[in-house]
Protein backbone atom coordinates (compact mmCIF):
# COMPACT_ATOMS: atom_id res chain seq x y z
CA UNK A 1 0.00 0.00 0.00
CA UNK A 2 2.90 2.34 0.84
CA UNK A 3 4.33 1.90 -2.67
CA UNK A 4 1.08 3.10 -4.25
CA UNK A 5 1.00 6.22 -2.08
CA UNK A 6 4.62 7.02 -2.98
CA UNK A 7 3.82 6.47 -6.66
CA UNK A 8 0.88 8.86 -6.49
CA UNK A 9 2.98 11.44 -4.63
CA UNK A 10 5.71 11.25 -7.25
CA UNK A 11 3.16 11.63 -10.05
CA UNK A 12 1.58 14.58 -8.26
CA UNK A 13 4.96 16.28 -7.75
CA UNK A 14 5.96 15.70 -11.37
CA UNK A 15 2.65 17.19 -12.48
CA UNK A 16 2.94 20.22 -10.21
CA UNK A 17 6.59 20.95 -10.94
CA UNK A 18 6.83 19.98 -14.59
CA UNK A 19 9.60 21.58 -16.60
CA UNK A 20 8.58 24.87 -18.15
CA UNK A 21 11.23 24.38 -20.84
CA UNK A 22 9.65 21.32 -22.39
CA UNK A 23 6.45 21.02 -24.38
CA UNK A 24 3.69 18.60 -23.59
CA UNK A 25 4.69 15.21 -25.07
CA UNK A 26 1.62 15.13 -27.29
CA UNK A 27 2.24 18.67 -28.47
CA UNK A 28 -1.16 19.84 -27.20
CA UNK A 29 0.12 22.51 -24.82
CA UNK A 30 1.36 25.60 -26.64
CA UNK A 31 4.98 26.38 -25.99
CA UNK A 32 6.16 29.79 -24.96
CA UNK A 33 8.19 31.54 -27.63
CA UNK A 34 11.11 33.60 -26.37
CA UNK A 35 13.24 36.15 -28.25
CA UNK A 36 17.04 36.03 -28.12
CA UNK A 37 19.86 38.13 -29.50
CA UNK A 38 22.58 36.17 -31.28
CA UNK A 39 26.00 37.23 -32.53
CA UNK A 40 29.13 35.25 -33.31
CA UNK A 41 32.38 35.52 -31.38
CA UNK A 42 33.63 37.98 -34.04
CA UNK A 43 30.69 40.31 -33.20
CA UNK A 44 28.77 39.68 -36.46
CA UNK A 45 25.01 39.82 -35.93
CA UNK A 46 22.24 38.16 -37.92
CA UNK A 47 20.09 40.11 -40.38
CA UNK A 48 17.91 39.33 -43.37
CA UNK A 49 19.08 40.25 -46.89
CA UNK A 50 17.11 39.15 -49.95
CA UNK A 51 15.22 36.57 -47.87
CA UNK A 52 18.49 35.03 -46.70
CA UNK A 53 19.86 35.08 -43.16
CA UNK A 54 23.33 36.62 -43.18
CA UNK A 55 25.84 37.67 -40.51
CA UNK A 56 27.62 40.98 -40.61
CA UNK A 57 28.57 44.17 -38.84
CA UNK A 58 25.64 46.57 -38.55
CA UNK A 59 26.27 50.15 -37.46
CA UNK A 60 24.26 53.31 -36.98
CA UNK A 61 20.75 53.21 -38.45
CA UNK A 62 21.40 49.71 -39.84
CA UNK A 63 21.34 48.23 -36.33
CA UNK A 64 17.53 48.16 -36.74
CA UNK A 65 18.03 45.33 -39.26
CA UNK A 66 19.20 42.93 -36.55
CA UNK A 67 17.13 39.74 -36.48
CA UNK A 68 16.16 38.40 -33.09
CA UNK A 69 16.06 34.62 -32.87
CA UNK A 70 12.70 33.26 -31.78
CA UNK A 71 13.05 30.13 -29.67
CA UNK A 72 10.56 27.47 -28.64
CA UNK A 73 12.22 25.04 -26.20
CA UNK A 74 11.21 21.42 -26.74
CA UNK A 75 13.60 19.73 -24.33
CA UNK A 76 16.08 21.19 -21.86
CA UNK A 77 18.77 21.64 -24.56
CA UNK A 78 16.78 21.22 -27.77
CA UNK A 79 14.79 23.98 -29.43
CA UNK A 80 13.14 25.24 -32.57
CA UNK A 81 14.71 28.43 -33.98
CA UNK A 82 13.01 31.08 -36.08
CA UNK A 83 12.89 34.76 -36.99
CA UNK A 84 10.18 37.33 -37.80
CA UNK A 85 8.04 36.50 -34.81
CA UNK A 86 8.47 32.77 -35.38
CA UNK A 87 7.01 32.91 -38.91
CA UNK A 88 10.27 31.90 -40.63
CA UNK A 89 12.07 28.89 -39.15
CA UNK A 90 15.64 27.72 -39.53
CA UNK A 91 15.75 24.25 -41.07
CA UNK A 92 18.51 21.77 -41.81
CA UNK A 93 17.69 20.43 -45.28
CA UNK A 94 19.32 17.51 -47.10
CA UNK A 95 19.49 17.86 -50.87
CA UNK A 96 21.37 14.96 -52.43
CA UNK A 97 24.78 14.92 -50.76
CA UNK A 98 24.46 18.52 -49.57
CA UNK A 99 23.17 19.73 -46.24
CA UNK A 100 22.05 23.35 -46.12
CA UNK A 101 20.42 25.81 -43.77
CA UNK A 102 17.14 27.17 -45.12
CA UNK A 103 14.50 29.56 -43.89
CA UNK A 104 11.05 28.02 -44.23
CA UNK A 105 7.73 29.83 -43.87
CA UNK A 106 6.37 27.82 -40.94
CA UNK A 107 4.86 29.05 -37.69
CA UNK A 108 7.30 28.02 -34.96
CA UNK A 109 4.54 27.36 -32.43
CA UNK A 110 2.89 24.84 -34.79
CA UNK A 111 5.98 22.62 -34.84
CA UNK A 112 5.90 19.38 -32.87
CA UNK A 113 8.97 17.57 -31.58
CA UNK A 114 7.26 14.20 -32.10
CA UNK A 115 6.65 14.66 -35.84
CA UNK A 116 9.51 13.34 -37.95
CA UNK A 117 8.96 16.03 -40.60
CA UNK A 118 9.53 18.73 -37.96
CA UNK A 119 12.89 17.34 -36.82
CA UNK A 120 14.70 19.43 -39.47
CA UNK A 121 13.74 22.55 -37.46
CA UNK A 122 15.23 21.30 -34.16
CA UNK A 123 18.65 22.33 -32.88
CA UNK A 124 20.57 21.12 -29.85
CA UNK A 125 22.14 23.89 -27.80
CA UNK A 126 25.62 23.37 -26.32
CA UNK A 127 26.86 25.96 -23.84
CA UNK A 128 30.61 26.30 -23.28
CA UNK A 129 31.30 29.13 -20.85
CA UNK A 130 29.90 32.33 -22.33
CA UNK A 131 29.41 30.88 -25.83
CA UNK A 132 26.81 28.60 -27.37
CA UNK A 133 26.86 26.24 -30.36
CA UNK A 134 23.86 24.79 -32.17
CA UNK A 135 23.88 21.30 -33.68
CA UNK A 136 21.15 20.16 -36.05
CA UNK A 137 18.98 17.41 -34.52
CA UNK A 138 18.12 16.11 -38.01
CA UNK A 139 21.74 16.09 -39.21
CA UNK A 140 23.99 15.16 -36.27
CA UNK A 141 27.47 16.64 -36.55
CA UNK A 142 26.28 19.68 -38.51
CA UNK A 143 26.51 23.00 -36.66
CA UNK A 144 25.07 26.46 -37.26
CA UNK A 145 27.91 28.66 -38.54
CA UNK A 146 28.92 32.00 -39.96
CA UNK A 147 31.76 32.80 -42.32
CA UNK A 148 34.82 34.76 -41.23
CA UNK A 149 33.91 37.22 -43.97
CA UNK A 150 31.13 39.69 -43.14
CA UNK A 151 27.76 39.79 -44.90
CA UNK A 152 27.83 36.12 -45.87
CA UNK A 153 24.94 33.65 -45.40
CA UNK A 154 24.50 31.86 -42.10
CA UNK A 155 24.96 28.17 -42.81
CA UNK A 156 25.85 24.76 -41.47
CA UNK A 157 29.21 23.02 -41.21
CA UNK A 158 30.26 19.52 -40.27
CA UNK A 159 33.74 20.80 -39.38
CA UNK A 160 33.08 23.01 -36.35
CA UNK A 161 36.78 23.56 -35.68
CA UNK A 162 37.55 24.66 -39.26
CA UNK A 163 39.31 28.03 -39.20
CA UNK A 164 37.08 29.50 -41.95
CA UNK A 165 33.80 28.91 -40.09
CA UNK A 166 32.55 30.32 -36.79
CA UNK A 167 30.32 28.01 -34.72
CA UNK A 168 30.46 29.78 -31.38
CA UNK A 169 27.84 32.39 -30.61
CA UNK A 170 26.75 34.67 -27.83
CA UNK A 171 23.09 33.94 -27.16
CA UNK A 172 21.23 36.30 -24.85
CA UNK A 173 17.55 36.48 -23.99
CA UNK A 174 16.11 39.77 -25.25
UniProtKB/Swiss-Prot annotation:
Residues the record marks as carrying a glycan: 107
GO BP annotation list: immune response; inflammatory response; negative regulation of interleukin-1-mediated signaling pathway
Signal sequence coordinates: 1-23
One GO cellular component term noted in the UniProt record for this chain: extracellular space
Major localization class: secreted
Origin: domain of life: Eukaryota
Subcellular location as annotated: Secreted
SS bond list: 89-139
SMART domains with a match to the protein in the record: IL1
Any one Gene Ontology molecular-function term assigned to this protein's record: interleukin-1 receptor antagonist activity
Key words, A-Z: Disulfide bond, Glycoprotein, Secreted, Signal
Similarity field: Belongs to the IL-1 family.
Function per UniProt: Anti-inflammatory antagonist of interleukin-1 family of proinflammatory cytokines such as interleukin-1beta/IL1B and interleukin-1alpha/IL1A. Protects from immune dysregulation and uncontrolled systemic inflammation triggered by IL1 for a range of innate stimulatory agents such as pathogens.
Name under which the protein is recorded: Interleukin-1 receptor antagonist protein
Organism from which the protein derives: Bos taurus
Amino acid sequence: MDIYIHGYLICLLLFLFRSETACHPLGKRRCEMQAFRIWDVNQKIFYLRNNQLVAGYLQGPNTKLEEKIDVVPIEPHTMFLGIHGGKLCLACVKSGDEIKLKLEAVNITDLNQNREQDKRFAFIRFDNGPTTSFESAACPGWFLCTSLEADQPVGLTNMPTEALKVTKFYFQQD
